[in-house]
């Protein structure tokens, strides 16, 4: 919200600087983003009166003699198409500073001396989007009353201070000058002064010219007035200045009046050309599937049943609350104007403007809410302005469909309730004074009082809201600092928090870097790497399809991060994330999904760089598995790795499921080359674990085992096996022999070659045995080896080499 300091001072009698006002507002609940002075950086810009204007042959230039208040006219060469004799213009004299700190100097153009520059508003730093179209390609023409030689700032209100407010959704009342005036008046203990318009109505009734009806419960009220015999023309300079300072382009006096009322009351309005109506009945209803509308910006909008439209003769003429239609827009030939003031459902307007990517000053106010109590007042004010600025004749009365509650909302509380929550010792007189400043009614006493909250403050409905208002106006800086009286208790991590912290520490100790990716993704990516996909949980109204579904895996988000970094020449990556996935086993439209904590990581590129001693080493499956092995070892958990080809987006020969107590808790492996290509990433290895399953399996107590004094004994065994036999199957077979003294199984060689028959491979293991209480003998170890050999032969068909 852009607030004109000049305009604000007309509504509230304050004598503070804009900077002091901004600081005060920021400390009482409405944040000020900044203050801008349009004239800042500009100098030596004066009013000029063009005395003569001659075309320069064979050029687009004009040789002008301009009166700038000096003794003699100033010769200026100007290329603007709309320069002519008799007009008042903006002149930058030599030494002047215009936009971008550009300094104007005397010069020659086509051999002709030019003693200054006739300026457009763009050259003063104003945006093209707010400059009247009649001046967008040429110079600005000043009012007739401008005096040659005067500084131009007061004529264009460039010396105003524009205060930019950051309005939160709960304070939509401040999206109007009247709302801001009420706020400032409350802060400084002043009274507001709102100008009144004298509306003179003709004998003809509005109901004779127009009829309105509502055919949707999303239209709360719809009111109209009719103004005849209007003269459409440019608005007076003061109104154009006011709109431009608020970031709105002046169009003509009729449209500008509706925008003025929007800024003043916060009530969106629209003006229709009555003579372009095919019928005299306006109906506000939901759009029908297949209907379309060409809006004021010239775009054809395809409508859905979720949109609200204003119709005449059952044809849409406006997109309710968002933008009018081109077919009934006001133009230079318009003579009879229909003014609309309505209240539409904010959620419906938000959906429509979001779907069409068509946000306007009107839609933003309907989305946040408008003041029910001033809808008709704003309508009458607009009609009176058209009577004043467009010489229109206002038909008597208005037509309206749908009624709104306009009486104040009553909220009750007590003085004790207020003081307990603020830690203050306010008296009832203090409370009365504060609510008087706010313009709220107050009845009762300190035991129980009732506040009559005006409809303009629809954010206040419960006692806690009253406490907040009291604190704001009393001053947050005046609230006493109180310390809690209860004794403190030592904080303790929950098991989930403790596991999360431990896993994070282990991951970072292994060289992984934490990331945080979006929980929302595309429906396809949401289930891309899920071991057991469930029903999708999708947003009903997503901002974009890329963020429309809750993820059921974390790997897809990690790969997006990998792709982002690889595209920026960062190819050696080791990333991890701890976050939630969302599983939905029932109806996603009726039930909330289960939120499950998961741990995932992704590695790609080199694990070791090339140097003078070693060759570069790329990451592989065993690096990924090694990270998991370290994690499980530190958590004192024993898992199994089972090869799988069931995960479509993982490499079928380099992927394994991770089993804990015979339950799948995750997977590890290489991303399928096709998937990696789709993500534009190199060979990448990933893993994902169910943290909830890890937490459930953690041993409650860990018993310390004394370090044995007795030495271990090691035996190597080389096995000839079928090529399909996995390492995990061999480990399982060795462990199933039931040798209690076996403490370690390590694979140290795998061989396939000419000396091995086709379809076979050789795998060599180092087995370590140890008795914590005694020395092992060779005979004991030999028996252990016999049992292990027998188990290997029976279970995996191994031959000892």
From Swiss-Prot:
**Could you name the Gene Ontology cellular component terms for this entry?**
phenylalanine-tRNA ligase complex
Please give the biological process terms from Gene Ontology that the record holds: phenylalanyl-tRNA aminoacylation
* InterPro entries cross-referenced by the UniProt entry: aa-tRNA-synth_II/BPL/LPL, B3/B4_tRNA-bd, DNA-bd_dom_put_sf, Fdx_antiC-bd, Fdx_antiC-bd_sf, NA-bd_OB-fold, Phe-tRNA-ligase_IIc_bsu, Phe-tRNA-ligase_IIc_bsu_bact
- Can you tell me which residues bind Mg(2+)? 459, 465, 468-469
**Cofactor(s) this protein cannot do without:** Mg(2+)
Q: PANTHER family per the record?
A: PHENYLALANINE--TRNA LIGASE BETA SUBUNIT, PHENYLALANYL-TRNA SYNTHETASE BETA CHAIN AND LEUCINE-RICH REPEAT-CONTAINING PROTEIN 47
Return the similarity comment: Belongs to the phenylalanyl-tRNA synthetase beta subunit family. Type 1 subfamily.
Q: What is this protein called?
A: Phenylalanine--tRNA ligase beta subunit
Q: Which organism is it from?
A: Streptococcus pyogenes serotype M18 (strain MGAS8232)
Gene, per the UniProt record: pheT
